[in-house]
Amino acid sequence: MAEVRPYRPGDLADLYWIADAADPDGCADANLVGEVFAAPYAAFSPATVFVAEDASGVGGYIVGTADTRAFEAWAEADWWPPLRARHADPSGRPHERWTRDDVMAWLIHHYRRAPDEAVARHPAHLHINLLPRLQGRGVGRALMTRWLEAVRAAGAAGAHLAVRPDNARAIAFYRRRGFRELDVPPLKGARWFGLGFDAPHLL
């Protein structure tokens, strides 16, 4: 049985590895996905990062922040600049020639603020990933429960997330947790869901 526990600094390599392993498209640089979607949360808000660990080691995580706008401001000042110096902006090349690494490098150089429509009532946000060995065993639910408790205790009024439109399994999971699709202007590659903490929801 997997144990859900708070993040420790020694877990950082696992965050990177799981982020890369869970990405359906894959990067040549195994750290790129984690640089965008996992590691910055461990640096900015380790108290709202949790991992799932079994006998084989850390096999899942949930990362996020109780304050999306504060995270975005911090990342713009402190997290993205050194990454932008290491990874060239691919904007000058034809999109049809971009690799997955180029897409991630573009995100580093042009990180999008979350839509106001998502943040206004749901200021926290999250990313969650599980390796296949931990899927379908209630581990995702346990991670989500711990994370929601943490950001609610930190004062967040609700949480939002973005999910790939074709990820039916993830969408079903979020709906079971009480997340509902938000009225957010369409953004290529994302559907937005939110959970208000003043409404009944399933933890």
Language-model features: where?
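A short beta-loop-alpha structural element at the N-terminal edge
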Residues: 3-16
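Conserved GNAT acetyl-CoA-binding A-motif
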Residues: 122-124, 151-164
